[in-house]
Design a protein with these regions (language model features):
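Bacterial N-terminal signal peptides
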Residues: 10-23
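Sec/Tat signal peptide C-region and signal peptidase I cleavage site
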Residues: 25-31
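C-terminal, well-structured catalytic/ligand-binding subdomain of enzymes
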Residues: 33-95, 112-139, 163, 169-351
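Extracytoplasmic mature domains of secreted/periplasmic and thylakoid-lumen proteins
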Residues: 142-143
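Secretory/export targeting leaders with adjacent low-complexity proregions
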Residues: 146-166, 173
Length: 351
């Protein structure tokens, strides 16, 4: 409650009042928000995952795994790599295809919907689908600067979703990665992202004299960006969860707060509001043992490391089938089978 009051005081009075009654307004189905808060040497990244379903797995991915991206379209050239970093990811569409996560170097990558995304045309570069792109970054890089340097050599070949990405690292560097008009656009310094392009969001926010309380992407961006520029007083982790309350919608499913400095992940869900935590520094990163997972709605709260269990194909397939049920007819033939079976083809190369 103290944190909520602090956040209210950090915003103009007109917003603070209307924010408390804005919950009844209708929200779009895809209303995700990601932001970074920073104070001194402390940094956290918050993510509100707003979707029409909330099932998911929290996955501990190991370093030393040899991987090859599955082709999405005829002519796609596979990307090949060996994971250099372990990571904790949040997966609704199966292992290796996360909606976001953080690696053991403190690099955070999160995915949000962007209707205006137009991906680059097929060419000779290696390609990854729109979700595996996130896992590739977490597997390979320690910083946003490394991601930016490597980005021109890779393209996204989408299965279905039109998305963009916000990446932040333990130094406080952030960048938005987008596909606009068939070109990859990277914006270093972005500290917040919702469901409009970063450029459009910044332009709209600059015209607002009072912080808006509405549910639209541009309104949520304005709130998140201004709070990112002036974080609420007090504990930064608690402040991030309070900010997530201010950008939430009736479809908010997951609230995630990453601490890239201390390599800690905290999360809560619509189905279980107790905060759960995982400490990457205490997890087994070696691929000598299987990837591990836990249901995102696990109960009770607290450290869930003891509830992690070895990855199994049946759990992965069940999640994918549930999550793709509504759009399965619009996916390429065999997509579900490919996604469900893909992790079984991965091998530990350097335990």
């Amino acid at each position: 409650m103290i944190i909520l009051i602090t956040v209210l005081r950090a915003l103009p009075l007109a917003f603070a009042v209307t924010a408390l009654v804005a919950g009844a307004a209708s929200r779009p189905a895809a209303a995700c928000t990601t932001f970074m808060l920073e104070r001194g040497s402390e940094r956290v990244v918050g993510k509100s995952y707003d979707w029409y379903m909330g099932q998911g797995l929290v996955v501990v991915n190991k370093r030393g795994i040899a991987k090859q991206s599955p082709p999405v379209k005829p002519g796609d050239r596979a990307a090949r790599w060996v994971s250099r970093h372990a990571s904790v990811t949040f997966n609704q569409y199966g292992r290796e295809f996360p909606t976001g996560g953080m690696n053991d170097a403190g690099l955070v990558v999160e995915v949000m919907w962007l209707d205006s995304s137009i991906y680059e045309r097929p060419d000779a570069r290696p390609s990854l689908n729109e979700l595996q792109w996130t896992q590739y970054q977490l597997d390979n890089f320690t910083s946003v600067a490394e991601m930016i340097a490597a980005a021109p050599g890779l393209r996204v070949s989408p299965v279905y979703a039109r998305v963009h990405y916000l990446a932040c690292d333990r130094s406080g560097a952030c960048a938005a990665f987008e596909n606009i008009g068939g070109k990859q656009i990277i914006t270093p310094g972005a500290r917040a992202l919702t469901n409009n392009s970063y450029a459009d969001s910044v332009a709209w926010a600059a015209m607002q004299k009072v912080v808006p309380a509405g549910p639209s992407s541009l309104e949520r961006f304005t709130r998140a960006a201004r709070l990112a520029a002036a974080p609420p007083a007090g504990d930064l982790m608690a402040g991030a969860f309070a900010v997530l309350d201010f950008v939430r919608s009736p479809r908010s499913q997951w609230n995630i707060v990453y601490d890239p400095v201390h390599l800690r992940v905290s999360f809560r869900t619509r189905a279980n509001r107790e905060i759960k935590t995982l400490d990457l520094g205490k997890l087994d990163a070696s691929c000598a043992e299987s990837a591990a997972l836990v249901d995102i709605d696990t109960n009770p709260g607290g450290d869930v490391a003891s509830r992690l269990r070895p990855y199994d194909v049946a759990t992965n397939r069940s999640l994918i089938e549930r999550s793709l049920q509504r759009i399965r007819k619009r996916l390429p033939a065999g997509a579900v089978e490919l996604m469900a079976g893909y992790p079984s083809a991965l091998a530990c190369q350097a335990p």
